[in-house]
Amino acid sequence: MKKNTGTIISISGFVLKIEFNESELPEIGFALEYHTHQGTYLAEVVQHTGINTVSAIAIGEVSGLARGTEVVNLGHPIEVPVGETVQGRMLNVYGKAIDGKPEPAAEVKWPIFRDQPLLRELDTNKEILYTGIKVIDLICPILKGGKTGLFGGAGVGKSVLMQELINNISMLGGNSVFTGVGERVREGIGLYKELEASGVLPQTTVVLGQMNESPGVRMRVALTGLTIAEYLRDEEKKDVLLFIDNVFRFIQAGSEVSSLQGKIPITGGYQSTLSKEVGDFQDRIASTKNGSITSIQCVFLPADDIDDPSAVATFSHLDSTIVLERSIAALGIFPAVNPLQSFSRALNPTFVGERHYQLAAQVKFILQRYMELQEIINVLGMAELSDEDRKLVHRARKIRNFLSQPFYVSEKFTGTEGTFVEIEDLLGSIERILNGDYDERSERDFLFIGSYKDLK
């Protein structure tokens, strides 16, 4: 069969202008194959610029590319291998192996662009997925088949918390897909080795598009990981865990591509299609009657701004929002989750039960009141508080410290053994603190313990 080929007539950064025969223009979204001295790469058609010319974004390197280079229209969007052959493997945006092992057998390939599930196919039955992490299970529980966002600035512990969630939830069984979008190479390699050491790698696929790669790679690698998860849900009818680190880099890559195309940006320099791009991606992450996709996503906050357009565009799609705060990390409390800014749709009596709901509400009330009293304490000191308020402050600090926790993934750095706290032990500990059973204990006794059973 004759190949449909075109010729590159201009190169501007990662934007390629390509000339085809007038009757053979590739459709928007189709993949084009080109060669450089570094290897074979793909580009994606994003615009028809003339009667016989298209504009394409390079999903790969352009170093060594020249005008006159031939490109081949593959006649379909980027397709990646899915199914059992990619489990236990580390792949790039094309679904090619980057773990030093042979290429996965491409028995089944799916295009990375897919429609979201129909409304009648969605499964509305939800249950709680307990993580063993105290502050998450108490304040912002994760729904099985739901979407959870970890929001925070640089260096507050998002990736470590993500790795702990991967460790704890993967132990429960099932299939996992980890997608590294524009993150550091060492984080991907470190995660791969940890999964290998813990024995859960055979049920996990790692897909990486690193921060040194082109914006096209960083924009599309999230779809590669999602497509692999969708196949497990739809064809193998499995419950899947989808971890994405970092959604901000996905949005940022889209912004770079938009700028390369010469489109006018909106507030903050983001692309004008921000809401649609995020919506198209998030709407595909859904649970159907065949199986579920439980998604946990890191979202970087530029300058710690929770009102950044990238965060705002993501908020509305999430069931649980976990906000990490620098001021809590500065106190040496990890995970540095702010219980007052974090919330979950699952925190209601229907999902968690009346006891859990009431305890979480009391914890939030005490911590909120403590924040209000903090201004008085800073100016006048504890002596100016009433006896009741002093008691509340001490209990609030005990709760704040108690919500810290040693992690399994950081054992080798801290020398402290990680803990998985069962929900009954967690609720029992909170009840005892709220009831005043430990009013005589030092606040420091509650730092980095599991439950009340660890108090000596």
Swiss-Prot record:
HAMAP family associated with the record: ATP_synth_beta_bact
Organism per entry: Listeria monocytogenes serotype 4b (strain F2365)
Residues noted as binding ATP in the record, renumbered to the chain: G152, G153, A154, G155, V156, G157, K158, S159
Protein name per UniProt: ATP synthase subunit beta 1
Catalytic reaction(s) noted: ATP + H2O + 4 H(+)(in) = ADP + phosphate + 5 H(+)(out)
Localization (cell): Cell membrane
EC number(s) on file: 7.1.2.2
A Gene Ontology cellular-component term: plasma membrane
Broad class of where this protein is predominantly found: membrane
UniProt xrefs under InterPro entries: AAA+_ATPase, ATP-synt_VA_C, ATP_synth_F1_bsu, ATPase_a/bsu_AS, ATPase_alpha/beta_chains, ATPase_F1/V1/A1_a/bsu_N, ATPase_F1/V1/A1_a/bsu_N_sf, ATPase_F1/V1/A1_a/bsu_nucl-bd
Family: Belongs to the ATPase alpha/beta chains family.
Pfam family, one: ATP-synt_ab
Membrane disposition: Peripheral membrane protein
Annotated function: Produces ATP from ADP in the presence of a proton gradient across the membrane. The catalytic sites are hosted primarily by the beta subunits.
Taxonomy of the source species: Bacteria, Bacillati, Bacillota, Bacilli, Bacillales
Keyword entries, A-Z: ATP synthesis, ATP-binding, Cell membrane, CF(1), Hydrogen ion transport, Ion transport, Membrane, Nucleotide-binding, Translocase, Transport
GO MF annotations, alphabetized: ATP binding; ATP hydrolysis activity; proton-transporting ATP synthase activity, rotational mechanism
Matching NCBIfam families: atpD
Keyword Ion transport carried by entry: yes
Subunit: F-type ATPases have 2 components, CF(1) - the catalytic core - and CF(0) - the membrane proton channel. CF(1) has five subunits: alpha(3), beta(3), gamma(1), delta(1), epsilon(1). CF(0) has three main subunits: a(1), b(2) and c(9-12). The alpha and beta chains form an alternating ring which encloses part of the gamma chain. CF(1) is attached to CF(0) by a central stalk formed by the gamma and epsilon chains, while a peripheral stalk is formed by the delta and b chains.
